[in-house]
Amino acid sequence: MNTQTGTGTSEVSKKLKAAIRAKLEELGVYVDDELPDYIMVMIANKKEKVQMKDDLNLFIGKSTAKFVDWLFDLFDRLQNASNKQGETSKKEEDKRKELEATAAAKEHEEKRRKEKEEHEKELQKEKEREKERQRERDREKRAEEEKRREEKRKEIQRSKRRRTRSRSNTYSDEEEHVRARGEKHDRHHHKDHRRGRSHERKIITSTIVRQASASPDKKLHSTVTVKRNIRPTGDQNIKGRGTMFLRAMNEASVSAGYGSSSKRSETHHEDDMSDVEALPSKPASTKSPKKSIRDRMSRISKTSEPPIEEDDAVVLEDFAQTGGGPQMILKLSGGREAIKKTRIQDRIVVDDGLRRGLLKRKIETASGASAGAATSEEPKSKHDRIIFDITPSRDSTPTDDSPTMQKWNGQIEIGDDSEESEDDEEAEIDAFVAEARGIARRESFRDEEDELPPTHQLSGGPYAYHHSTAAPTYIPTPLSVLSEQQNQMGGGAAKEDHHVKERCIFWPKCTKGDTCAFMHPTTNCKNFPNCTFGIRCLFIHPPCRFDRFCTKKHCPFTHHGTGGQQPGGAQLTSEFKNPLTSSRMLTVPSPFIAATAAAVEELPKPAARGALGSLAEKLAASIKKKPAPGAESEKKEEKSDENESKAEEPKAEVAPVQPKPLPDIAPLHSMVLCRYAGACRNPICHFKHPKECRFGANCRNPSCYFYHKPAGAAPTPVAAPIAAESAGAAKYKWTSATAN
């Protein structure tokens, strides 16, 4: 440390000595080697400022005061620098110690935190182990408890079985009496029922019988009444009227007194329901009739005999006078009109579902005192009745082991009703709603057909649409679907506009605006460029860059310069002075033009060369009359003859024109410029060409637009294509030009 201090002091002394020498030289004082050493000795002796001035005045002279002031100022700066350096080093040392203390504290804190976490983890593991041990103890307790309960349950069951065994060995006198009485009643009253049932299972025929006539009332020996629970039948198409019909039937049940929760019935036996199996059923039914009857009978309780009720009942009766077979009188609520409106005569479904629905109504069974003469009749009520006369066939023998029966092939006759009840009104409302659905559906179809726009020509060909005038069979529709359809149809009718469903030929330059009766397209065509409607499309096609000069026959783009017509439309040329220079239109009768336009519209794709036959004939006639080129006088005469013949030709050609060959006429492109212009050498080219130059072969303008006939060139015969294209050209024969 001392060595470093001494080294630093010597360096400071050297620097100070050099600074003193430089300052003296700056002041202009003569400096030798001893003067800086003398000043350094004075500094080391720490002489005061005044003493130093007195001692140096001899050597420095006038600059003594200035030099001494500079020297002491330098001492002050060095002193301040050394003090600051010491303070800085002290601060750094303090900061370093503080950082070391902070690091030690953090390390200690981290160590304590890790120890705490490890301790918490250990406690958590211990808790988990304790919980697992507790669960194990609980499982053992539950197993023991379950075992005790199982033993107790088994003991109770054993005691019950012992009591049941002891009870089953004895019968009370009352039970014996009831059983004996029931067996006697079965043998006495239901012997013929079993025979009739087995016979009915083989063959059943159904016929219509008239309404039962009124007769003195007779008591019924037994009556079975079942609580009505109306369910929809198996037909899934009757959902539309299901809710209203169900509500009406339930209200009728409550008003009749048997729709409540009370049940009234009398003593019964399984054979009392023998006639139930005589109801028609589907042979493909999967449920056994005996099983279903057993299930129904199990729900009937024994009560005292109630009075006979008139409303909505299914009565099973035996009529001895009808041939010995069982008969069923089914009373249906509602009149002829309600059933008629719902078209029940077309939609009667006889299946297991309907049979169950009928059986769940009030059932009244009548059994006579003897097997042959028991007859029960009902008084007339205000409701209609449907009577099924189920009689066995005479050619079949009754057997007890007949397991099947044939399908019900009966008919239904509806009697008139003189009065109407609330149930009838509900049925009429239901039927009216159902009828209104069919009428609304048919009317909506007719309205939709009437509103179809006359755009059948847009589809590339007229397709016939055959609408059936026959009334459709009634198929009920849910009210939600019906209302949605009616809303859609009503919305479509409200949006009907007054525009004709055809595009305006002046669009987009039409000046009428919204008052125009034709359609102005507003949206782009989605099928472009595959749209097949062409100029009849009601949507926007992009404009063609060639516009009215377009030569493509079925160009899908829009051409505003053709007045709404497709380029290459039906246009007939006029006098055939020269096919390459003709620019005038032929004047023909208006019926011919109308028929031609109609024929062209009907043809989806016009023939390529159908109308060129007549032009070829004209060309052949004109060329035939031209002689070989000679003197100018001969040319003038030939031209005059040619003009006269051509003036006569249109008159001769227009007269015999008939609409018969119209389907073969193709549109001419006389308003479309030929791409070769005056250089075209096709004598039957049907595009528009410039007029013939008046200078002819003598024209000296190399860029002349007009047509120049080749000088000295004989006309080239083109009879082969002309004859192939038109049968009328066969009468012309080509001859040499020099033969004339």
Curated annotation (Swiss-Prot):
Pfam family for this entry, one: zf-CCCH_2
Q: Which GO terms describe its biological process?
A: regulation of mRNA stability
Which segments does the record annotate as C3H1-type zinc fingers? 499-522, 523-543, 668-691, 674-691, 693-709
Molecular function GO labels: poly(A) binding; zinc ion binding
Gene Ontology cellular component?
Answer: cytoplasm; nuclear speck; nucleus; perinuclear region of cytoplasm
Q: Where is the composition biased (Acidic residues)?
A: 414-426
Q: What is its main location?
A: nucleus
Residues of the region (Disordered) are: 82-240, 254-314, 390-426, 444-469, 623-661
Basic and acidic residues bias: start-end ranges: 87-158, 176-185, 632-652
Q: Where is the composition biased (Polar residues)?
A: 204-214, 393-409
Where is it located?
Nucleus; Cytoplasm
Q: Where is the composition biased (Basic residues)?
A: 186-200
Coiled-coil intervals:
none
Q: Which InterPro entries match?
A: Nab2/ZC3H14, Nab2/ZC3H14_N_sf, Znf_CCCH
Keywords from the UniProt entry = Cytoplasm, Metal-binding, Nucleus, Repeat, Zinc, Zinc-finger
Top-rank lineage group of the source organism: Eukaryota
Q: What does this protein do?
A: RNA-binding protein involved in the biogenesis of circular RNAs (circRNAs), which are produced by back-splicing circularization of pre-mRNAs.
| Assigned protein family | Belongs to the ZC3H14 family.
Name the chain's protein. Zinc finger CCCH domain-containing protein 14
Per the UniProt record, the source organism is Caenorhabditis elegans
Q: Please spell out the taxonomic lineage of the organism that makes this protein.
A: Eukaryota, Metazoa, Ecdysozoa, Nematoda, Chromadorea
